[in-house]
A protein has these predicted regions:
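Phosphate/nucleotide-binding beta-alpha loop and adjacent structural elements of enzyme active sites
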Residues: 2-230
Length: 230
């Protein structure tokens, strides 16, 4: 889905959402031009975490780090630090140019050190480890799992926000994640209307004491807040 369509969706959802969640809606209205996210994931994160400054993030499937980024605003205005994971070589140059976050180029899966193919699509935002209809290039890369990624970049055991948007293997990433070792405050996870995957994600998040929030607004995502967050 292109950026123009997302803009229309954002405006439509915002108008309806305003009447149900006034405080959050006001925050979005004031800051909507600063948001780079598809559907205000960055603003939702800030609102739920009390507009925290100097937080930490992991963005898995970061695109070019600017357009449709869930962490650009967090880094630039709120001084957050973290890691952007993006295997697409076309996007990596822009991340290195425009972001302070560390860049991980290996695909994130449920296994470390496995050689797999990564497929570039015409639209870089659709590139993934799963072969799509409009593949224009492919190359082999070694994988890394989320647990090792966090350890590699010394992010710490408390992580404020993890965004997962990998065009298909979101559940596989989560099922091997050490929820007991790492205390995450907020997740945004793309399901892209795959009901089977969505159900599996919901089960694993509920099992690990996460509560789904703002179902109406999350559209192609599901958003989960740690139940320990007040």
């Amino acid at each position: 889905m292109n950026i123009k369509i997302y803009t229309i969706i954002k405006i439509y959802l915002l108008l309806i959402f305003f009447f149900q969640y006034r405080k959050l809606a006001n925050f979005i209205l004031i800051n909507k031009t600063l948001s780079k996210s598809q559907i205000f994931q960055d603003l939702i994160c800030l609102h739920l975490l009390n507009y925290k400054k100097r937080g930490t993030f992991v963005e898995i499937g970061g695109g070019n780090g600017v357009d449709l980024s869930n962490t650009h605003l967090l880094e630039k205005k709120y001084n957050w630090k973290g890691v952007i994971c993006e295997p697409d070589k076309r996007s990596q140059k822009k991340i290195l140019k425009n972001r302070f976050a560390k860049l991980e180029v290996k695909p994130i899966t449920n296994k470390c050190g496995k050689q797999i193919y990564f497929y570039e699509e015409e639209d870089p935002y659709l590139s993934s480890i799963k072969k799509g209809k409009n593949k224009i290039n492919s190359y082999k890369l070694k994988t890394i799992c989320l647990n090792h990624l966090i350890s590699k970049y010394k992010i710490g055991n408390i992580i404020d926000y993890i965004s997962i948007d990998t065009e298909g293997n979101e559940f596989e990433i989560l099922k091997k994640f050490n929820f007991k070792k790492y205390n995450v405050n907020f997740f945004t996870i793309e399901h892209n209307f795959n009901l089977v995957k969505r159900k599996k994600i919901k089960q694993i998040m509920k099992k690990n004491k996460f509560k789904q929030v703002y179902k109406f607004l999350s559209y192609m995502d599901d958003w989960y807040i740690n139940t320990n967050i007040k």
